[in-house]
């Protein structure tokens, strides 16, 4: 099972101090989806977080055996999360990435758990206790590389019962009084993501215009790209829970159930072919100008 979830710090009552009631739909959805997945035979939870360590040219997988973190950054240091890492699965994902020439692994520094990791686990821990974790960051690499890395995860988890959580808020510019003010790209981006979730249209995660993405001030897209790769050639049933953005940031929750194989959903290869065709068209167009010159 996989899911896309947001990570607003104020959803934690000790941080929100009552303000969290404004996003009650998100809280109810979080409770519902985590309650549901707790009935599944989960051994390991993979969390992809935009707030874990991020490099421009390398996807970081947290090393070590154990990690912890708290919300002292948000004045709630008493709320603490501890995890044991699935070192065996970390090794398998790293090996798969190396085999497929994706720059990913456990090199570099590590730090305490980030809020993009802890908030989903805060809700999961209410219903499920005995599991290990793999924590993965995002990078400045291309959309297709994030998708291909997701395929490495898929290869590595073949014989394992895994829950994959793609942590990420949507646009941060939905309202004038939001963190980045209002930009028209914000609601448009959120609409496109919600539609893509509802239709399991993972190609959409790869095809956004980079300037549009920058203007939308989004957070979760690369997490979703990795998740999409992990579901490559899988038959998917989407379970959309909720969407709201009262503070000017989009919070959406959607789960994806795997219902078997679907070889037509080789979205990475379809995207690559699409890009090659576009480059070919541009080149042909350039050739016309060269001839005219």
Residue positions per predicted region:
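Flexible, D/E/H-enriched segments
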Residues: 1-43, 55-151, 177-291
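Structural motif
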Residues: 44-46, 163
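Catalytic metal-binding/acid-base residues of hydrolase active sites
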Residues: 51-53, 170-171
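Acidic/histidine-rich, metal-coordinating catalytic segments
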Residues: 164-173
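Non-transmembrane, aqueous-exposed alpha-helical and coiled segments at domain scale
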Residues: 151-157, 162
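Short, flexible coil/turn micro-motifs enriched in small/turn-prone residues
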Residues: 163-164, 215
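Glycine-rich N-terminal segment of FAD-binding domains in flavoprotein oxidoreductases
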Residues: 50-51, 176
